[in-house]
Amino acid sequence: MKPGKRVPLARPNRINKEIRVTEVRLTGIEGEQIGIVSIAVALQKAEEAGVDLVEISPNADPPVCRVMDYGKFLYEKSKSIKDQKKKQRVIQVKEVKFRPGTDEGDYQVKLRSLTRFLEEGDKAKITLRFRGREMAHQQIGMAMLERIRRDLCESENSIALVESFPARIEGRQISMVLAPKKKQ
């Protein structure tokens, strides 16, 4: 086969003359049950309506067929699949690093980015790293995490819930994870 040539995909549903059974359970255009009829009658009804006869459930006994516009059916199906994909969203964990000596301006900038992450629906991991003699002043780091928690979770317009708050320090850093609040 030549490169660049596509093989036409087989249709997921058989339509019109592709249906090779003697009788089918027929459903009308509006979804109303017509009953069990021969394939010739079903094809005639589809032709009278100016649409296709589509085999919906080939494994049923007798197979279920519906009188409908096949092109419109495929379009609506692809549209619903696109809508489902649009609604799916992978939640990421975004990390923001602080130090015990983070000044007010930097603190506000990092707080804004934390707010943005949470409003976008992502989780936020706050890591507070200690260097050198900062290890002797761990209470400053805990106070900073407490302040972040107050600003994002306990204010009147809180946007986050604490998922994990550190009870103690692991090595040279403390971590806290915040999850976005569910919107009502």
UniProtKB/Swiss-Prot annotation:
A Pfam family for this UniProt protein?
Answer: IF3_N
GO cellular component annotations, sorted alphabetically? cytosol; membrane
Query: What is the annotated localization of this protein?
Result: Cytoplasm
Q: What is its main location?
A: cytoplasm
Tell me which UniProt keywords the record has, alphabetically.
Cytoplasm, Initiation factor, Protein biosynthesis
- Which GO terms of the molecular function aspect are on file? ribosome binding; translation initiation factor activity
Note the PROSITE patterns from the entry.
Answer: IF3
According to its UniProt entry, one GO biological process term is: ribosome disassembly
The protein's role, per its UniProt record: IF-3 binds to the 30S ribosomal subunit and shifts the equilibrium between 70S ribosomes and their 50S and 30S subunits in favor of the free subunits, thus enhancing the availability of 30S subunits on which protein synthesis initiation begins.
Task: Enumerate the HAMAP family for this protein.
Answer: IF_3
UniProt cross-references to PANTHER family, sorted A to Z:
TRANSLATION INITIATION FACTOR IF-3, TRANSLATION INITIATION FACTOR IF-3, MITOCHONDRIAL
**Matching NCBIfam families:** infC
- Record's subunit section: Monomer.
Similarity comment: Belongs to the IF-3 family.
This chain belongs to the protein called: Translation initiation factor IF-3
Organism source for this protein? Hamiltonella defensa subsp. Acyrthosiphon pisum (strain 5AT)
Name the gene for this chain.
infC
